[in-house]
Each structure stands twice: as C-alpha cells, then as structure tokens.
Amino acid sequence: MKNKTEYYDQFISKIPNFPKKGVLFYDITSVLLKPEVYSSLINEVYSFYNFKKIDCIAVVESRGYLIGAPLSLKMQLPLVLIRKEGKLPREVFSEEYELEYGFGRIEVHKDDVRTYSNILLIDDILATGGTLKSSAILLERAGGKVKDIFCFIELCAINGRQSLESYEVNSLVRYN
C-alpha cells in the first residue's frame, strides 16, 4: 500500500501526554471533520482491498469501526465487531492484550466468525501490535482466519509489525 503520510498528517491531531504522561496520542477523529479527507481514506483502503480475496471485515473498538464500517458497506461484506470486555450480550471468546500504556481485554461473539477464512482485520493505529495480535488470535480461536491487517497509522519506531509477522500488514500513514 502506498505511503500517504504527507497528505494525511495535516488532518491527524497529535495530543501529547494522553491518555497518560509520555504518550503522544494520534487522534484520527479530526479526519472525520473533513468529509472529503474521510472519503479519500475509505476509497484508498477500498481500492487496495477490493480485488483481494476477503470475505469478512473485523474491526477493533472503537476507532477501527470508523474505517471498517463504511468499508464493509462499500465492499458488501459482513462486519464483525471486536469489543472491550463486557460489551457483547451473547457468548464470547476473550483475550487479554497489551497497549502502549497498559493492559486490556477484548471479546468477540463466538458465533460471528466461524466460517470466514479471509478476514481483513482493521484498527486505526499500529503501535505495539498487542491489540491486533490479540484480535487475530481471538478471531482464529472463534474459527476464522485472518488474511490481512490494515491500520490507518503505523508508529514504526515501536515496531509493532514484528509481532504480526505471520500476517500481511498494511498502513497508509507511517511515523518513525
């Protein structure tokens, strides 16, 4: 996927010391304030994945939803939600994950994933790779197979891609 850092960087807000001191938070919600930029993002991802063999899109709560939901509609594919612990009403698989700034737990409905063999997993940012790795493990434990991973932003210096080396990982914006 072509690196589009120069273009999108101007629309991404950077908030120092959030959610805790020493962390620089990359806020993609500012992209949503510019419909033409948001549309461009969705179209870029669509153009890259439209001709790949994808049968489902899985998204990580919550900012992954902002990319995955419109993309699933555009590609006419099912959308599977990966949520934080305690937010899903049916029986779930769960997995602990490590963040750049702590730990958490994610869940997916047991019966949402079982037949998909070419899942595109989407999140807004790749930092440590902990959330995405745990999400991939979760989807595979539920019977699916992750084919590709897409993140809008990749923090290359943290080297989260290394923990995802068994997957094809793509990003549009790469910060060193």
From Swiss-Prot:
Listed EC numbers: 2.4.2.7
SUPFAM superfamilies: PRTase-like (SSF53271)
InterPro entries reported in the protein's UniProt record: Ade_phspho_trans, PRibTrfase_dom, PRTase-like, UPRTase/APRTase
GO molecular function: adenine binding; adenine phosphoribosyltransferase activity; AMP binding
Pathway(s) the chain acts in: Purine metabolism; AMP biosynthesis via salvage pathway; AMP from adenine: step 1/1
Biological processes per GO annotation: adenine salvage; AMP salvage; purine ribonucleoside salvage
UniProt main location, coarse: cytoplasm
Subcellular location, record wording: Cytoplasm
Single GO cellular component term: cytoplasm
Signal peptide: none
Catalytically driven reaction(s): AMP + diphosphate = 5-phospho-alpha-D-ribose 1-diphosphate + adenine
Keyword Nuclease: no
EC top class, as a word: transferase
Keywords, ordered alphabetically: Cytoplasm, Glycosyltransferase, Purine salvage, Transferase
The family this protein is said to belong to: Belongs to the purine/pyrimidine phosphoribosyltransferase family.
Assembly, per entry: Homodimer.
NCBIfam families with a match to the protein in the record: PRK02304.1-5
PANTHER family linked: ADENINE PHOSPHORIBOSYLTRANSFERASE
Role, per record: Catalyzes a salvage reaction resulting in the formation of AMP, that is energically less costly than de novo synthesis.
Name the UniProt record assigns to this protein: Adenine phosphoribosyltransferase
